[in-house]
């Protein structure tokens, strides 16, 4: 689903992966959960890139991204968080916020998260029932930081 459609679904309450609304937009659990807690941050309103935001909105967006990372460190036990803003496929601003774990094989842990084979990435997809506790824990951890 495109970022535009996900933001529309988040606004209407029909996006099951929504963690919470934040000052700059929305946080959702990513479709891929091969790295537990992988989140996507989406601005609201949707804009083409970070450079299209005012300085104040840009600061808020990046601050929110760090808050999400702090929450993921608390909830998941990850040792580090990877942050990525690319927008090459879906050409609008959104951020990938990915917990990294010491239990990952070195060849993957020492690289970017998209180096995992597709079968590994597709093996654990977001599931409302399975991920509801994780979603709530992340929501609470973000909420206490806002």
Task: Locate the predicted segments by residue.
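HIT superfamily nucleotide-processing domains
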Residues: 1-146
